[in-house]
């Protein structure tokens, strides 16, 4: 029987099991199965996935994120805020501004601290990727993929594709509560046009600086929040002329609010909370 210490954290209800790989060891070949096991709500701890906080050669810490189906993702906005909180509070970093390595690249985190506790984290998510090759999508073309039609159940849905280090398909609707989240979501997620699958967001514009947001995440299904998805939604809204670049936009997710801005300089900034749920030791056995 193997075991490791963990911290379960969430960003707006998007929860992961966090493992400090500065102290713990999980064999590389076991990571996918361990992520699937520990995330199981019935036989594990229950979460949207597992995130490893690892040493890095190019930053103070590195984040590796696994979905609850065992697949590894390249980035996770809510996860990055929680990693930033963990790293500062566990003295893996000393400054309130520091970098985090991800499979999608290096991002900059800034934490707000009160009495030694991180109450808010802001992440510079970098510039959005908008070409088919960068998202990635099948086909050629260097222009952004904006409001392209997708036929489902005899209804045409127009979506805009954005990558924030992971791929997103953003669909604007009149009411997110009536959006086909659990039906169209998995169909679009696994469509052949997205070779790495895709996260699917449904967006309802409320006014010039507010939107409602619901998400079907690749590898996880419906979740309470998706930080990179909120960033992609704001970028898509601006590309479609629905919102103004440079303004801070409030994104109302099922789990709470994020503040997102696509700056004139090109990067996307995400600000929001990160909270600890519980800590403990997880025991597991890998069958031979």
From Swiss-Prot:
Protein name: Diaminopimelate epimerase
Domain of life: Bacteria
Metabolic or biological pathway, per its Swiss-Prot or TrEMBL entry: Amino-acid biosynthesis; L-lysine biosynthesis via DAP pathway; DL-2,6-diaminopimelate from LL-2,6-diaminopimelate: step 1/1
Enzyme class: isomerase
Annotated site residue numbers, Could be important to modulate the pK values of the two catalytic cysteine residues: 168, 217
Example of a GO biological process term: lysine biosynthetic process via diaminopimelate
Subcellular location: Cytoplasm
PANTHER family, per the entry: DIAMINOPIMELATE EPIMERASE, DIAMINOPIMELATE EPIMERASE, CHLOROPLASTIC
Cited SUPFAM superfamilies: Diaminopimelate epimerase-like (SSF54506)
Cited HAMAP family: DAP_epimerase (MF_00197)
Function (record text): Catalyzes the stereoinversion of LL-2,6-diaminopimelate (L,L-DAP) to meso-diaminopimelate (meso-DAP), a precursor of L-lysine and an essential component of the bacterial peptidoglycan.
Active site: 76, 226
UniProt record similarity statement: Belongs to the diaminopimelate epimerase family.
Catalytic activity, reaction form: (2S,6S)-2,6-diaminopimelate = meso-2,6-diaminopimelate
InterPro entries: DAP_epimerase_AS, DAP_epimerase_DapF
